[in-house]
Structure formats: C-alpha cells, structure tokens
Amino acid sequence: MKNLEHINLPFNIELFAKQVVEGFITGKHQSPYHGFSVEFAEHRLYNTGESTKHIDWKLYGRTDKLFNKRYKEETNLRCQLVIDASSSMYYPNFEKPTLEKPNKLLLSVYASAVMMNLLKKQRDAVGLSVFTDKLDVHTPNKTTQRHHRVIYHELENLLKVDAKASIKKTASIDALHQISEMVHKRSLVMIFTDFISNDKTLDEQFEAYKHLKHNKHEVILFYLSEPTTEINLEFDNKPYKFIDVESGEEMKLSPHLYAESFKKQSQNHLKELKLKCLQYKIDLVEVDINKGFDTILNSYLLKRQKMF
C-alpha cells in the first residue's frame, strides 16, 4: 500500500485493487498465499472436453481411468462483503479523504475492492451488501466479470456520497437478518463496521450475528477505528465541540479531562465485543485504518485455509 498512497482520489478502484493484490502475492506474503492456493485437495473424474493439464497420469496407469487433480484454489468459496456505510463510518471527517489519510468508509471500500480481486483470482464467488439505516445494496455472490463490474460501480458510488448531506444511523440488526436469509448457506461473510450504534446494546446487535451463524455462515468481523482519537481521545489541550455524526447532537468539552475514563470505557467495550465473538465463534479483527490492508488480507487467507 505504501507505494500507492500518493495517488489522489477518486481514481480507478479496480486498478488499485489489482496493484495491491499483485504486490501482496509477490511480496513478503508470498508463502501463505501460494500455500493455500495450490495445495492438493482431491481427485475428481475427468470430463470429456476439459483441459488435460491436471490429469493424474500415474493414477490412470493404476486404474485405467482419467482423474483430474483438484487443488484447494479450485474449491469454490462464496463470500459476501458487507459494508456499514452509516454516518459514523465517515470519521475522521476529512474534506477529501485519501489513502494516506482515510476515513473508515474509504478504507472499507478499497479493502473490499482488494478482497474482491483476490477472490476473483481464486475463482471464488463474491457479492456485496451495504447498509445504513436500511439495507441499501445487495448483490448475490457470483463469479462473472460483469458481476464484478457491478460491484466496482457500487463501491465507487459509496465514495461519491456526501456524508454531510444526510445523517444515516446504523441499522445493522435488520440488515444482517436480511443478509443471513439472502446469502447462500455456508458462505463466508466479511463485515466492515465500527460497531457504533447509539440505540442498541451489544446483546441486541449480536442477535443478528447469531442468525448468520445459525445459517452456517462463517463470519469475519473487521472492527474499524481511528485509535488515536476514537479510543484514546488524544486531542490538543483545549476545548472542542464534539458532534455525534449519527444523531447530530453537539457537546462542548475539554477532551483531556475525560481521556482516562473514556479510554477505560472504550477498552471495556472492546473486551465485551471480543467475548461475544468468542462465544459465537466469530473472527474479530481489529483494524487501525491508518495501517493499510495487510491485516485484512492475512485474516482472510488464514480463514480460508481453515475452511478448506
């Protein structure tokens, strides 16, 4: 990612995704990528007209039957990328977010594009869901080039939305219940969210995650934050006006007076979130939006290896 941070936005998301994936595969993460992508899985009967590239001729000599070697790269995976696009995801509220200074939504959009490109390389099916105060976008998981173009278009549209134009609260519960029923069973569901919901407890929110698990989905929850200000409340020693981006409520205060108690509250929230994810066998991945895509890509690769 570091070599691409100078690029101004908006620019071609698809091109960016290809560059990141190629760099990831050929760079320091080469071994784990190739480890799962070409690992032998099983034999399957050869069908007339197929390429003879993967025929196991030694097995043919023993059985007088044609079998193809099937690799784990060929084991189809269905993946649904889910993005929380509520108002809190536009934090930090930069006038023009960049890859060098992203907000949570921008990182989610580009991370989703990168993930889709990686899934495409593995011939896995991918779909996209986006929610705010309702389920705004839902595409089924498919493998076609035309479908990939549709998803890129939806991702680009997310970057064009003016966060100041309308306040969008989070309605993850209803959206995830819908997604649970709409996505093919036993899919991998990857959710990008900051887990900010003003009117719902974690217990209430996890009812939807329980639904995902009940329908045999594997879930990776990417918990995005800008830790310096969102968790540690590190600001200059002066009064600020804070605005709740999902309610519009305003409050004036001096952050340094509340930093310790706020940090403790944030840590307790994270601890509770970790316990909930552990309870329901959900992979929780903490993502510092200032540190790029490696954490996200590595988490996916490890999960895929475990699934197959």
Segments predicted by a language model, with ranges:
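Short, electropositive alpha-helical surface patch
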Residues: 137-155, 280, 302
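An amphipathic, basic-hydrophobic helix/alpha-beta surface used to engage anionic
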Residues: 1-143, 188, 192-193, 198-200, ...
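Short, contiguous clusters of charged residues that form electrostatic/catalytic patches at enzyme active sites
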Residues: 110, 114, 170-177, 271, ...
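Von Willebrand factor
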Residues: 147-187, 199-200, 230
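Von Willebrand factor type A / integrin I
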Residues: 1-32, 36-42, 51, 181-185, ...
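A structural preference for long, well-packed, hydrophobic secondary-structure segments
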Residues: 75-78, 88-94, 166-189, 221-224
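Conserved phosphate-coordination/catalytic loops
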Residues: 106, 166-173, 264-267
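A generic local structural motif
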Residues: 66-68, 175-178, 206-207
